[in-house]
Amino acid sequence: MKALVLSGGKGTRLRPLTFTCAKQLIPVANKPILGYVLDQVAATGIKQVGVITAPETGQYVKDYVNDGSKWNLSVDYIPQEPLGLAHAVKTARPFLAQDSFVMCLGDNVTGKGLNTFVQKFQKEHLDALIILKEVGNPSSFGIAQLDVEGNIVRLVEKPKTSMGNLAIIGTYLFSSKVHEAIAKIKPSWRGELEITDAIQEMINMGFKVKAEILNS
């Protein structure tokens, strides 16, 4: 298993802090958020990490992470234009090859780490495991609907009508079958390849897509 850490984006909502650094490098308790993300990746035993970078901030990320040896990781840098999370996976295909992988945002840390998610994904032989959390403003997120067994049956990006409050928070685990789904989707109205569309396509194709709901 590999990891794909998304460290692109311009961080416009965090300006002026992001005029001189990537948003993933903003410190929390004197440590960049990206450092915590890499801590969690390393704790799973994963060794190979692809870091998606943006043209504007990629060098800042490289200067901090370097070769990844600080975390006992081997890091490949993958430049990408901001064309959606599924496009990031598509861009990273040469690095990912046929391996399963954890994908997480470089500015987003889960309180319980990644180990339990990796264990569930591998034990149940899943094609996708999507981490969800209840939110109070579902119209601002991608929202998932589940069946009684915890399988995801439908995903909608920023729904205009009520369909629950289980939001996608930016942590995903995929088998190589995600590439088949990405090959079938088209850009959304905003010109991006959406990861929600790719996951929905996996569901439509009959792949095993489950959810894990965070309680904290």
Task: Name what the model sees in each region.
Residues 25, 144-146, 211:
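A structural signal for short hydrophobic beta-strand segments in well-ordered beta-sheet cores
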Residues 112-140:
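Conserved donor-nucleotide/metal-binding helix-loop-beta segment in metal-dependent transferases, i.e.
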Residues 9, 107, 134:
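Active-site glycine-centered loops adjacent to acidic/histidine catalytic or metal-binding residues
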Residues 19-24:
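Short alpha-helical oligomerization interface
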Residues 9, 56, 176-177:
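Alpha-helix/helix-capping structural signal
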Residues 2-5, 13, 26-27, 31-105, ...:
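Conserved N-terminal catalytic core of the sugar/cofactor nucleotidyltransferase
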Residues 136, 140, 145-154:
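Ligand/cofactor pocket segment of small-molecule handling proteins
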Residues 102, 118, 122, 151-216:
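Catalytic-core segments of class I nucleotidyltransferases/pyrophosphorylases
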